[in-house]
Amino acid sequence: MVSQGAFAGMSRRAFLAKAAGAGAAAVLTDWAAPVIEKAYGAGPCSGHLTDIEHIVLCLQENRSFDHYFGTLSAVDGFDTPTPLFQQKGWNPETQALDPTGITLPYRINTTGGPNGVGECVNDPDHQWIAAHLSWNGGANDGWLPAQARTRSVANTPVVMGYYARPDIPIHYLLADTFTICDQYFSSLLGGTMPNRLYWISATVNPDGDQGGPQIVEPAIQPKLTFTWRIMPQNLSDAGISWKVYNSKLLGGLNDTSLSRNGYVGSFKQAADPRSDLARYGIAPAYPWDFIRDVINNTLPQVSWVVPLTVESEHPSFPVAVGAVTIVNLIRVLLRNPAVWEKTALIIAYDEHGGFFDHVTPLTAPEGTPGEWIPNSVDIDKVDGSGGIRGPIGLGFRVPCFVISPYSRGGLMVHDRFDHTSQLQLIGKRFGVPVPNLTPWRASVTGDMTSAFNFAAPPDPSPPNLDHPVRQLPKVAKCVPNVVLGFLNEGLPYRVPYPQTTPVQESGPARPIPSGIC
């Protein structure tokens, strides 16, 4: 594939003149005309990737794409014709497990009646075994049986629940204001920690020679355990500034499963308190250090942001609180227009959280190096493996927003991305290689440059985002489920019966951004 970047700064005439000088103009005109027209068709570009000086990354928690945006207009959602919306294993009429019973996706209504349960649903099983059983060898039809193994009968069908615009209005407003990606996948068929390891290092070390394979979420996060190279090290070596801003508000619980830190402290390389990994990957606090750096024009070129767990949207924590977190993050950037106008903020979700998604992820063929746990590793000694060697990924689809003056307008990108795509974007912008990225994964995921609309003038004006605090009163009803749901014993949300097939909102097609032009 010819990169459009090859034509940067060169007119059509200059391109063909250069080709003619090599005696190949006639051949190249026929061969390259479609490429040239695509590269120049929009006319002069209003922006370029180099105009983005700050890339800010934030991963929220445990929501699939269909679960949040199956009803959004013009995306690959509930209007897509597929039998996969009819999942077997639960009978809505009898409200019981039934191998032949069919459950359709159903709305979890948070806007009327006793909505506390809907706002804070029980936490589904989303670890390595359950995710692979849901995927079911690529059939993508094991969602309900996978939950029945570990969850109560009444809480099994919550994986088929979804939210609509009235339930998560801020999320839908973000999709209408910026760029949403409807083919963004988690990196691994499993839970939080391994996916976040992909977010900073593009691997979980399946070969097991540097502290892995780490394929499940441990109760206590490993300290100074792993030794493989991570993206922050490559950035430091290249002279690119970076920080990981972690919430410190849980104190002694920051290194337990109740926290979601950046995991830099899990690597032996961070043992020296004078090292870049310790100074920039462990010490910075969110939000205070982040706010200070934005205001003082000292925001690094690359930032990983890790809010407090209760703000992460992880079930059974309230989705409305997560909306507050996202809006507050955007508002921090808006406090300094000079920073905002040259920043790209990417907000995605680390994994599907057990919630259904109808798009079967692309996975690597068995035995693909770096994408399966090899036979040289004793699989029975790999915590949480259940004897399953792979595939590692891609995982299921998750929501992803690209928020920037260069991604305004309710845009939609259909290119395939995963968490390593965020690292690939950093690599593309700053010329830094992504460590551990397998050839297979590099060949099937993009670098996210196509999510930007560089052909249009940037729009740095403050977006019209209603602050979601008005959604918070209903959160008080969540208190019992916040505790019980995180322990997998939450009050169930009753599946409505009779069921109806969900539909997407009506509306025009969403424009596709230009990417690099």
Curated annotation (Swiss-Prot):
Provide the GO biological process annotations. symbiont-mediated disruption of host cellular anatomical structure
Location in or out of the cell: Secreted, Cell wall
Q: What induces it?
A: Expression is induced in vitro in the presence of phosphatidylcholine. Also induced upon infection of THP-1 macrophages.
**Gene Ontology terms: cellular component:** extracellular region
PTM comment: the record says: Predicted to be exported by the Tat system. The position of the signal peptide cleavage has not been experimentally proven.
Name of the featured protein: Phospholipase C C
Q: What class of enzyme is it?
A: hydrolase
Q: What is its EC number?
A: 3.1.4.3
Per UniProt, what is the name of the gene that codes for the protein in this document?
plcC
Provide the reaction this enzyme catalyses: a 1,2-diacyl-sn-glycero-3-phosphocholine + H2O = phosphocholine + a 1,2-diacyl-sn-glycerol + H(+); 1,2-dihexadecanoyl-sn-glycero-3-phosphocholine + H2O = 1,2-dihexadecanoyl-sn-glycerol + phosphocholine + H(+)
User: This protein's superkingdom?
Assistant: Bacteria
Work out whether the entry's keyword set contains Amino-acid biosynthesis.
no
Q: Supply the source organism's classification.
A: Bacteria, Bacillati, Actinomycetota, Actinomycetes, Mycobacteriales
Q: Please describe the relationship between pH and activity.
A: Optimum pH is 7.
